[in-house]
Amino acid sequence: MSDTTQVGWQLSEHAPLRALNTFHVEATARWLLSVHTPEALPQALAAPEIADQPLLVLGSGSNVLLAGDPPGCVLCFENRDTAIIAHHADHAIVRAGAGVNWHALVLYSLQQGLSGLENLALIPGTVGACPIQNIGAYGAQVGDFIHVVEAFDRHHQQFVRLDAAACALGYRDSVFKQQPERYLIVAVEFNLPLLCELRLDYAGIREELASMGAELARAADVAQAVINIRQRKLPDPDVLGNAGSFFKNPLLPNEQIAALQASFTDMPVYPGEHAGLGKLSAAWLIEQCGWKGRREGDAGVSPEHALVLVNYGTASGAQLLDFARRIAESVRERYSVILEPEPRIIGAHW
């Protein structure tokens, strides 16, 4: 393996990726570009070895399934600076580099007396990845607090600042997901209130707060409740390879949901993000089809949470992908509902 090191970036050849994805599957990058200072990005991308190569950005690798070796170059941002850049009477603007660990940012915001991100505690990944999927959990989504996304526009070869509207944030969607070849996120600015109405819609959070003796909850209490729940329900990727929730919760027209409920009266339904749509529980659908806790070789579904696909040891990305496809097919056959994966599939098609 040969390395090229310049000010602000490093390029490595034939780099193993097992430690850079939370499924812990084996894969190799032809080139691995590590960028420490975003200002060096244009120079790094012009390196002759990778100038015309496809580019895959990996944060902590918590939202990808490497079903094969990625083509071209893998890019990792190593800028991990966090700071409050503006104070106001009722809110503050926090800027975090793309390489900052997401949960570390949540804890930082709480330590600074800021709220808004507490429901998103312990989500694996980095700040640079959070706008791409518009990450969300327990009734909250990061898009509600994004002020500006700083990115390098590869089409125009310049750095740009995109406000929340320009990011086109939707349910697990954004302009960055729609145009993956265009923008490279280098930092995100968040508009975080000093006091925010707590989102306690999920019964599990209310029950956890009660067990903590925190009926008069603060944002930090909600974060701790979420941490407790996630640690009980979701396996630690450092111990058991996984990427959190593997499937999106399906959004369907209310008419289709009503027809399903007529046949499956115990099917849980939640409000959708838009009028006329409802949301089904992908976990419920998968469990009803008998997949929860099922294991084939080293590929399986967590016995604690039906949405979590796990690698018990040496399953390949291709084996995990085949397992996930069969889960989705069984749900389609029984309910006529199409499940879509949350992680990006690399090296194969869904």
UniProtKB/Swiss-Prot annotation:
Coiled coil: none
This protein's record includes keyword Cell inner membrane: no
Domain FAD-binding PCMH-type: 24-195
One GO CC annotation: cytosol
Reactions listed under catalytic activity: UDP-N-acetyl-alpha-D-muramate + NADP(+) = UDP-N-acetyl-3-O-(1-carboxyvinyl)-alpha-D-glucosamine + NADPH + H(+)
Pfam families: FAD_binding_4, MurB_C
Keywords recorded for this protein, A-Z: Cell cycle, Cell division, Cell shape, Cell wall biogenesis/degradation, Cytoplasm, FAD, Flavoprotein, NADP, Oxidoreductase, Peptidoglycan synthesis
Localization, UniProt: Cytoplasm
GO molecular-function terms, A-Z: FAD binding; UDP-N-acetylmuramate dehydrogenase activity
EC numbers for this chain: 1.3.1.98
Enzyme class: oxidoreductase
InterPro entries associated with the record: FAD-bd_PCMH, FAD-bd_PCMH-like_sf, FAD-bd_PCMH_sub1, FAD-bd_PCMH_sub2, MurB, MurB_C, MurB_C_sf, Oxid_FAD_bind_N
Cofactors, names only: FAD
Active site: R172, S245 (proton donor), E342
GO BP term (any one): peptidoglycan biosynthetic process
Keyword Cell cycle attributed: yes
Pathway note: Cell wall biogenesis; peptidoglycan biosynthesis
Family from the record: Belongs to the MurB family.
PANTHER family, per the entry: UDP-N-ACETYLENOLPYRUVOYLGLUCOSAMINE REDUCTASE
Protein name per UniProt: UDP-N-acetylenolpyruvoylglucosamine reductase
Organism expressing this protein natively: Xanthomonas oryzae pv. oryzae (strain MAFF 311018)
Species classification: Bacteria, Pseudomonadati, Pseudomonadota, Gammaproteobacteria, Lysobacterales
Gene this chain is encoded by: murB
